[in-house]
Amino acid sequence: MAHFALVGPPDARRPRLGRPVGGSRTSAVGGVVLLLPDGEPMSGRRASLRAHAAMLPLGRALERAGRSEGLAAHVVRYRARGWNGTDADLAADASWAVTEAVRRYGDVPVCLAGHGLGGRAALRAAGQEAVGAVLALAPWLPEDDVAAEPEPVRQLVGRRVLLVHGTNDARTDPELSFRFAERAKKANRDTCRFEVHSDGHALRQYAAEVRALAADFVLGSLFARPVARPLTDAMAAPPPLGLRMPLAVGFGSARRR
């Protein structure tokens, strides 16, 4: 078994929201999306600048799509990049970010949107009262272990939940996110999952479609905007259909014109 040495205590640093994606806002904020970058299972190293930068294109796309409703997007800066076992540091930082967003903007709906281990953090921190929606992209979820408690799902009750996973992801197992979605669907019917055929962990091959789906989901969840038929069908379909919904090539292209 590999052993990991933490470099400096995560608690010596503080998580941060920083400036909103797209610059300072001049209009009223009607909702917030908190973007949670990928991380590492065990590490005390400073949060990755590369992982932070990887969330910016999605943040910009969501901010543009939700500008008329006053959507603010922030990429959360973790104390450190590691989940770190039962400490679940990334989830703790995500919970802090929700509290900070409410302090900063008032009583507005919040969506947690994470990638990789940030996806796990988004799902875990969903129990915060202000959270109305959770988007988990290629989420890193643990293997089933009879000696450990399964990844919790009760905190998702009352939230709208979307998981998106590439079928060729070599870093995080898409089958584990499917199993998680199965359990989550039993606790919370407003759960669905899309599969991106032949795409990998970074979801680069169909990035435009993934961003369009994310915008549809976030704006529909936070502001009750009408959403595309595939998303409606996925939410309504029983397992496994609504948990293995294929993301069609060109999804959202008509809206992008």
Where are these regions (language model features)?
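Short, surface-exposed "cap/lid" segments of acyl-processing enzymes
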Residues: 2-68
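Alpha/beta-hydrolase active-site loop
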Residues: 84-104
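Gly/Ala-rich beta-loop-alpha elbow adjacent to hydrolase catalytic centers
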Residues: 113-122
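A conserved short beta-strand
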Residues: 130-142
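Acidic catalytic loop of the alpha/beta-hydrolase fold
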Residues: 142-143, 166-173
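Short alpha-helix in the alpha/beta-hydrolase fold that links the catalytic acid
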Residues: 149, 173-183
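Short beta-strand/loop motif that positions the catalytic acidic residue
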Residues: 156-157, 162-169
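C-terminal catalytic histidine-bearing segment of alpha/beta-hydrolase fold enzymes
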Residues: 189-257
